[in-house]
């Protein structure tokens, strides 16, 4: 009788036999991962299927995200033209002097990405029809398929759909009778007929840009970034010759329009922020009074006005400096920065409307040869490993 030969073990099974960590209890493994930096966690996910299953598992993912949400970070996108490089720098939002981390990537000589505010630890970058998704915490950046358009004026928003647990990018392109150029509210072209292409990309393997239909003929306000909250994207636009707030539901992929307050004066660069869990628009101001219009009820188109008086900060920035609104932290503090970007070291101003105090926050580690800096607030670290999306 012929003896049946032993089935040879797979390389993965052999590695598991010699992996000392295989005898550790799951709770201890998770504890080790929680104390590891995001880059190390991402690399460990490629060591074995066992570690990968833990890292990608719901238990560890929920624990890691819960901790990240409790400790938000400041994220800076820095451009260095002499080195043809953009890099991200982050630090603790609670104590900007501590826990500094940087990750860089080299660009083509003619390419510089503009980044949308990060969502769930991921960030979207675009340069004309080229686009990418990145995880600044792990240093992984993945190119997306080129945006399908022949037009030059492109506006994109990055968001997360909590209903279906999906990340999506909304892209809009514009054509006007006079050709694309930066808009001004007083420009007559704002009232001329226009057409728009609307495309959406869902993050995942083998995905493509999909064309969408929008029943509202509008043009977005190019002077303001969009914002995503609770699975809905918001951006400023013109609809029926009126300044409006457009919204896009990431789950149903449907557009809607909301009227802006009649007495709201929208300047060239309107800012959209999350104010105490609600969408708000900020009147651009270089100093003095600052008005926030808060959307209290979307269905009823009800807005409330919140006035914030920013005190004189001459002693901090000097007489010849202008300050510009940058955002509102989850704590309610108002962030201001200088125009133009200050010389090294980079700093911004943090104003507490409750205490009526302003302070200068200096950020170390960015270097001295930067040309442009974008600041993102309430950034959360993510250990997510991005799949190939092209």
Swiss-Prot record:
Domain F-box: 18-67
Main location: nucleus
Keyword Nucleus: yes
Cellular compartment(s): Nucleus
InterPro entries on file: F-box-assoc_dom_typ3 (IPR013187), F-box-assoc_interact_dom (IPR017451), F-box-like_dom_sf (IPR036047), F-box_dom (IPR001810)
Sorted UniProt keywords: Kelch repeat, Nucleus, Repeat, Ubl conjugation pathway
Pathway(s) this gene product operates in, as recorded in its UniProt entry: Protein modification; protein ubiquitination
A GO CC annotation given for this chain: nucleus
Entry keyword Iron: no
Quaternary data: Part of a SCF (ASK-cullin-F-box) protein ligase complex. Interacts with SKP1A/ASK1, SKP1B/ASK2, ASK11 and ASK13.
Domains (record comment): The F-box is necessary for the interaction with ASK proteins.
Function per UniProt: Component of SCF(ASK-cullin-F-box) E3 ubiquitin ligase complexes, which may mediate the ubiquitination and subsequent proteasomal degradation of target proteins.
Name assigned to this protein: F-box/kelch-repeat protein At3g04660
Organism: Arabidopsis thaliana (Mouse-ear cress)
